[in-house]
């Protein structure tokens, strides 16, 4: 079985990409009045005779379809493409090994561009299941066979032979029946004989009965599978047998070969499943003596195929297979006729999903399909008459309505009194003895009930008198400041959330505890609430958190509950970094989590608390040893449950709590654990309130449940998946209890230990070691991320403050002010900035300044200077501080000023085309003081007369000129750099009087593309000229149809993200040290 499932996965990977072309091929072969059917022909045990007989059946069906379409006035062509398996590649004499064969045939059809409108075949369950997955639910499939449970409830698959699901429904119905003259007992036990040599149909029928999570197993109290012939033979006369009923599958010859002439106990009933054999209804057939203890389950006979050319030499079982292929053709013809008459396209998903919940005219009469496309039929239960030695009909069963109809009310059975015996041995003692024992038992029971009631009354009285554990507030201690709440590997934890967590965590009796708000103000609990609290005190179980009592703090009442270090299960599932899927949270760990919750709930349901009422993944917590514990139980009269995604549908409709409601909540949690997705994950709905509404209001439709992807489950996962689906059944009575859930998971969990030859403690230690290694890796990884983040922060600081200042702040926490003997300071501003703002929107002004100053910043980066600040349109730069650089400060400022002026000669505004932007530049050198001012948003500021003079040099300058003081020129003369300058003459500087100033015009042997400054010297004329330029620019914009840009939320993103947002981790050494 495991090998086959691995084949399924492998072939899915190999062939899945090829099916993407199905839709185009189907469109080619299903249009313009020509429709093609793809028929897969596979030779195996399901149809051992020559495949030519199946081809004859298909051809006969095609002739019938063509005639029916012609009679309906539809002039279309219907043909079939036959694809045969390659016996040299696939030597599969058994359907149970034909997975690859079916996929290979499908690939051949696809490569040949002959993909038809519908796929007929194969009969093998494995092949059908895999091909259904690979056609991606968009292609109709009709199968003659595919009996297994894995092919149930497939949206585009139709099965024309009775599947195992129908057989289970009959057996459960018959077992429960107890109101017939010949069956007065309900049965609840059975043996199932299965040796692995059965035919294809029998293999899957018995496989369904064997599955521990199937409907049949769920309804029976006892079921044992017999796998050896000797086991079957021993049961026939074993007085200690647990059941009188044995189910097997095959014909009378198979039974005789197994049983022979051995004696059989008089209470034994053998149910022989032989559905596809109508020889029992022949007039000349006599039942052999060994069939007297046997009830034969078969299908109602059909004689239409007996004289057909293609089936004349076939065995009865093979005739049914051939008939299914033929009816598959007729079914397609029926649906094709309907769609063509309605003018609809058959290559749409609607056609693929239409083969269900209908009745069509088959070869031997009407054929009915149920809501899932499975054929409905009439099953017949036969018995051997001891008078006539003939097979007679005992009852019939209609699979469509799931109802039994008795036929022979006075059968001549071999069993005593012509009644079917009880299924359990030894239920036939004398009536007097039954009466004696019954009376004795009733008296004992009454005495026991009276004793229990008296005991319960005394305990309840004690509980009412006893005061629950109310802890004095002085025994609750806050956590120490050096105690952390939980281990966290995130470097950006929310400190506010951490503070709230601290308020809810305290210490009691030297243990860390959680304080649960009970929404109670005064602590005067009612009698019922006191009983609930006392019940909680008595619970002490490994998978349930301990309740220590209540405490009153301020005006609030808290429950004091055991603390679990790793937080809730929901948090663990969300943390894919600390608990990765591949190395830690594997399938075995998920099973152990489910097992822990099931054990805790099983104990809780058997305790006095009886029910949880608020079970969800956030109420399941994980301790330091990775053990899952349930919390927040009890106190249902204090904290009534609310509607949530975990709430059972019956409690959404009517507020209540129940054990079956807890089982539903467990199913939702199990889906979270298995898929590790959000609560109630489903692709069809994302909104929480809508999910709750759809669960509450099913309105007779298919119940709304989260996705579980049963089709892709591996073999080891399938049993758990089916268990989860049973937990969220709409009918609460169909849900298993936690005892059964615990038993099932214990068996599955035990298999892991047996395979690895290790105990539970070995597994726990191994998991903690694995977690420790993973934690070390994560700590190392987070350390690297921290260092990278620290370097990123340093780079950002260096853009705001000088490097030496940042280093001093990090090392000392402050920067000492310092006096610098000689520095050079640069000032510039935009001429006519106020006028430009008048004709621009605020966002256009921001865009303009951002474009200009980003370019200034790039120029500044190439010189040994420090950008001090920008205020409006003013730009201030200094050199020679905080790191002294000799005479370089004047050279760097001068070169920088020339490059900035050269750039401004090429700059043009987008919203005012043609308008030149004029700037004034002033430069001055001298002493100044510098230091960091303030704590919030600290800034490195300059102080002294040099700063004021540099500002005066700018304000007294002219547009597109670099106004330089005499002190700066004197420093430049002391250097080897030959700067070009002109004497401006005497200039009045406020606070300093008249001084000789200069125009910096360039540098020898280096060309700067400086703009030509305006020739007008008079200030008023300059303003008039600038106003004329703006007016011309506005006319150009209007003529070109350029509209003012609408304000943008982040104007600076226009030409790329701000540089400080582009900072990333760096490979350079950190500057932290």
UniProtKB/Swiss-Prot annotation:
EC nos: 4.6.1.2
SMART domains for the chain: CYCc (SM00044)
Effect of residue 387 to G: In MECIL; activation of guanylate cyclase activity is 60% lower than in wild-type
Matches recorded under CDD domains: CHD, PBP1_GC_C_enterotoxin_receptor, PK_GC-C
PROSITE patterns: GUANYLATE_CYCLASE_1, GUANYLATE_CYCLASE_2, PROTEIN_KINASE_DOM
Gene Ontology CC, one term: plasma membrane
GO annotation terms (biological process): cGMP biosynthetic process; intracellular signal transduction; receptor guanylyl cyclase signaling pathway; regulation of cell population proliferation; response to toxic substance
Endpoints of the signal sequence: 1-23
Localization in the cell: Cell membrane; Endoplasmic reticulum membrane
Enzyme class: lyase
Annotated TM spans: 431-454
Domain remark from Swiss-Prot or TrEMBL: The protein kinase domain is predicted to be catalytically inactive.
Disease annotated for this entry: Diarrhea 6: A relatively mild, early-onset chronic diarrhea that may be associated with increased susceptibility to inflammatory bowel disease, small bowel obstruction, and esophagitis.
Function: Guanylyl cyclase that catalyzes synthesis of cyclic GMP (cGMP) from GTP. Receptor for the E.coli heat-stable enterotoxin; E.coli enterotoxin markedly stimulates the accumulation of cGMP in mammalian cells expressing GUCY2C. Also activated by the endogenous peptides guanylin and uroguanylin.
Quaternary structure and partners: Homotrimer. Interacts via its C-terminal region with NHERF4. Interacts with the lectin chaperone VIP36.
Protein name: Guanylyl cyclase C
Protein species of origin: Homo sapiens (Human)
């Amino acid at each position: 079985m495991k090998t086959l499932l691995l084949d399924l996965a492998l072939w899915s990977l190999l062939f899945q990409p090829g099916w993407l072309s199905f839709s185009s091929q189907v469109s080619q072969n299903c249009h313009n009045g020509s429709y093609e059917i793809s028929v897969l022909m596979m030779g195996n045990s399901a149809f051992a005779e020559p495949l030519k007989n199946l081809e004859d059946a298909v051809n006969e069906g095609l002739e019938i379809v063509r005639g029916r379409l012609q009679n309906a006035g539809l002039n279309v062509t219907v043909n079939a493409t036959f694809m045969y398996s390659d016996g040299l590649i696939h030597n599969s004499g058994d359907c149970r090994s034909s997975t690859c064969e079916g996929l290979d045939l499908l690939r051949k059809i696809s490569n040949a561009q002959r993909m038809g409108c519908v796929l007929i075949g194969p009969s093998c369950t494995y092949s059908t299941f895999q091909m259904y997955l690979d056609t991606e639910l968009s292609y109709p499939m009709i199968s003659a066979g595919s009996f297994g449970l894995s092919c149930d409830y497939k949206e585009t698959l139709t099965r024309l032979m009775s599947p195992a699901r129908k057989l289970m429904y009959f057996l459960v119905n018959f077992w429960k029946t107890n109101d017939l003259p010949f069956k007065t007992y309900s049965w609840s036990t059975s043996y199932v004989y299965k040796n692995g040599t059965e035919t294809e149909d029998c293999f899957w029928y018995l496989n369904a009965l064997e599955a521990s999570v199937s409907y049949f197993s769920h309804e029976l109290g006892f079921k044992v599978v017999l796998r050896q012939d000797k086991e079957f033979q021993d049961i026939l006369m074993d007085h200690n047998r647990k059941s009188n009923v044995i189910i097997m599958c095959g014909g009378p010859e198979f039974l005789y070969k197994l049983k022979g002439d051995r004696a059989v106990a008089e209470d034994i009933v053998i149910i022989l499943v032989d559905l596809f054999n109508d020889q029992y209804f022949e007039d000349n057939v006599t039942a052999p003596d060994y069939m007297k203890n046997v009830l034969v389950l078969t299908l109602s006979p059909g004689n239409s195929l007996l004289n057909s050319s293609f089936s004349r030499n076939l065995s009865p079982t093979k005739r049914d297979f051939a008939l299914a292929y033929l009816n598959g053709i007729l079914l397609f013809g029926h649906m094709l006729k309907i769609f063509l008459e309605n003018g609809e396209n058959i290559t749409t998903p609607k056609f693929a999903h239409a083969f269900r919940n209908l009745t069509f005219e088959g070869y031997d009469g009407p054929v009915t399909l149920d809501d899932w496309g499975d054929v409905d039929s009439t099953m017949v239960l036969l018995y051997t008459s001891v008078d006539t030695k003939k097979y007679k009909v005992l009852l019939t069963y209609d699979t469509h309505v799931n109802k039994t109809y008795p036929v022979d009310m006075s059968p001549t059975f071999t069993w005593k009194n012509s009644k079917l015996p009880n299924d359990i041995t030894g239920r036939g003692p004398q009536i007097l003895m039954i009466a004696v024992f019954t009376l004795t038992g009733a008296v004992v029971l009454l005495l026991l009930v009276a004793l229990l009631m008296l005991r319960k009354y005394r305990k309840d009285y004690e509980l009412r008198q006893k005061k629950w554990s109310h802890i004095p507030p002085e025994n609750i201690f806050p956590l120490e400041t050096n105690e952390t709440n939980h281990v966290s590997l995130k470097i950006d934890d929310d400190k506010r959330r951490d503070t709230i967590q601290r308020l809810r965590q305290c210490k009691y009796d030297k243990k860390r505890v959680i304080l649960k708000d009970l929404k109670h103000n005064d602590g005067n609990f009612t009698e019922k609430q006191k009983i609930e609290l006392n019940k909680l005190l008595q619970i002490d179980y490994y998978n349930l958190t301990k309740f220590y009592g209540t405490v009153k703090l301020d005006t609030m009442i808290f429950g004091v509950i055991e603390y679990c270090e790793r937080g809730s299960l929901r948090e663990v599932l969300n943390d894919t970094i600390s608990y990765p899927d591949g190395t830690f949270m594997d399938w075995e760990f998920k099973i152990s989590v489910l097992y822990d919750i099931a054990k805790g709930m099983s104990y809780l349901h058997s305790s006095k608390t009886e029910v949880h009422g608020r079970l969800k993944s956030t109420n399941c917590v994980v301790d330091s040893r990775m053990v899952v514990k349930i919390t927040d139980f009890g106190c249902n009269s204090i904290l009534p449950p609310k509607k949530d995604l975990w709430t059972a549908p019956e409690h959404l409709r009517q507020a209540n709590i129940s054990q079956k409601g807890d089982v539903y909540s467990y199913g939702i949690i199990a889906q979270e654990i298995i898929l590790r997705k959000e609560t109630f994950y489903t692709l069809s709905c994302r909104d929480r309130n809508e999910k709750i509404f759809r669960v509450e209001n099913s309105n007779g439709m298919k119940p709304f449940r989260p996705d579980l992807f049963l089709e892709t489950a591996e073999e080891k996962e399938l049993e758990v998946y089916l268990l989860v689906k049973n937990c969220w059944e709409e009918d609460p009575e169909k849900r298993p209890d936690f005892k059964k859930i615990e038993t099932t998971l214990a068996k599955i969990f035990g298999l892991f230990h047996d395979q690895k030859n290790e105990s539970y403690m070995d597994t726990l230690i191994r998991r903690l070691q694995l977690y420790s290694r993973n934690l070390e890796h994560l700590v190392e990884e987070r350390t690297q991320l921290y260092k990278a983040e620290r370097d990123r922060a340093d780079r950002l600081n260096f853009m705001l403050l000088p490097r030496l200042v940042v280093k001093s702040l990090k090392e000392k926490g402050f920067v000492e002010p310092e006096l610098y003997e000689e520095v050079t300071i640069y000032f510039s501003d935009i001429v006519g900035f106020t006028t430009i703002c008048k004709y621009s929107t605020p966002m256009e002004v921001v865009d303009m300044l951002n474009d200009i100053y980003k370019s200034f910043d790039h120029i500044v980066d190439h010189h040994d200077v420090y950008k001090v600040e920008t205020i409006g349109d003013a730009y201030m730069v200094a050199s020679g501080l905080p790191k002294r650089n000799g005479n370089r400060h004047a050279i760097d400022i001068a070169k920088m000023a020339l490059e900035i002026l050269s750039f401004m000669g090429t700059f043009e505004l987008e919203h005012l085309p043609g308008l030149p932007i004029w700037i004034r530049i002033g430069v001055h050198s001298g002493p100044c003081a510098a230091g960091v001012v303030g704590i919030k948003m600290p800034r490195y500021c300059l102080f002294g007369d040099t700063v004021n003079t540099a500002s005066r040099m700018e304000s007294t300058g002219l547009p597109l000129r670099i106004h330089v003081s005499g002190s700066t020129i004197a420093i430049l003369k002391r250097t080897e750099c030959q700067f070009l300058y002109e004497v401006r003459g005497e200039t009045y500087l406020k606070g300093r009087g008249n001084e000789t100033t200069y125009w910096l015009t360039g540098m020898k042997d280096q060309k700067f593309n400086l703009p030509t400054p305006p020739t007008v010297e008079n200030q008023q004329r300059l303003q008039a000229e600038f106003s004329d330029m703006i007016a011309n620019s506005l006319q150009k914009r209007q003529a070109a149809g350029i509209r003012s840009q609408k304000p943008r939320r982040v104007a600076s993103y226009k030409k790329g993200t701000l540089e400080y947002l582009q900072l990333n981790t760096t490979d350079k050494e950190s500057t932290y040290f």
